[in-house]
Amino acid sequence: MNRWLAAGGILLGALVVFSFVSAGAWGGADGVAGDTITTINPSYEPWFQSLWTPPSGEIESLLFSIQAAVGGIIIGYYLGRDRPRGQSQDMGSDLP
């Protein structure tokens, strides 16, 4: 019962916090950087253009999610692989 109550409280808290954020606050860093550069130097021209633009926002989100998943797998593998090795070295030091 306490677990469900805690999960419900966390979910309710997240909903309250996110309900106060306007849609404009979710803009990306690229858009903010582009606006700042244009403000500083209106005659600025980019050095290069994208080689490929995803056909839709959903594809772009999918690629970002895959990138995050691969990064998480790599970090998880490293942490999972590194910890047992450190524990086995500690266990061997107690032997006479």
UniProtKB/Swiss-Prot annotation:
Membrane topology: Multi-pass membrane protein
Keywords recorded for this protein, A-Z: Cell membrane, Cobalamin biosynthesis, Cobalt, Cobalt transport, Ion transport, Membrane, Transmembrane, Transmembrane helix, Transport
GO biological process assignments: cobalamin biosynthetic process
Compartments reported by the entry: Cell membrane
The keyword Transport appears for this protein: yes
A Pfam family annotated for this UniProt entry: CbiN
Transmembrane segments: 4-24, 59-79
Tagged with keyword Ion transport: yes
A GO-annotated cellular component: plasma membrane
A GO molecular-function annotation: cobalt ion transmembrane transporter activity
Pathway recorded for this protein: Cofactor biosynthesis; adenosylcobalamin biosynthesis
Source species, domain of life: Archaea
Binding partners and assembly: Forms an energy-coupling factor (ECF) transporter complex composed of an ATP-binding protein (A component, CbiO), a transmembrane protein (T component, CbiQ) and 2 possible substrate-capture proteins (S components, CbiM and CbiN) of unknown stoichimetry.
HAMAP family xref list: CbiN
Stated family: Belongs to the CbiN family.
Biological role stated in the UniProt entry: Part of the energy-coupling factor (ECF) transporter complex CbiMNOQ involved in cobalt import.
The protein's name: Cobalt transport protein CbiN
Gene that specifies this protein: cbiN
